[in-house]
């Protein structure tokens, strides 16, 4: 697993390729957090959508990338990312 990555609301980081990114979108309720998945961010045909997770869910997979959510608050999320298939 990689080092921790800390994102505030609106900040992005790359997933396994630089075409795919995620951004922290905050917490729409006290028990739910949201991550935006973005595809082809530099292209004209870029796509993005929100993913919603219960705050209790600490292990998630986005685009075949394992993500461990170490801490999540309304303003900040701390993650560790690793890849496997």
Segments and roles (model prediction):
Residues 1-85:
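Surface-exposed, beta-sheet-biased, low-hydrophobicity segments with strongly acidic/polar composition
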């Amino acid at each position: 697993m990689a080092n921790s990555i800390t994102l505030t609301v609106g900040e992005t980081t790359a997933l396994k390729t630089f075409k795919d990114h995620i951004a922290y979108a905050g917490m729409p309720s006290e028990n739910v957090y949201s991550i935006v998945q973005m595809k082809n961010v530099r292209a004209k045909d870029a796509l993005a959508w929100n993913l919603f997770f219960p705050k209790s869910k600490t292990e998630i997979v986005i685009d075949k990338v394992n993500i461990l959510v170490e801490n999540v608050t309304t303003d900040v999320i701390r993650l560790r990312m690793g890849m496997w298939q």
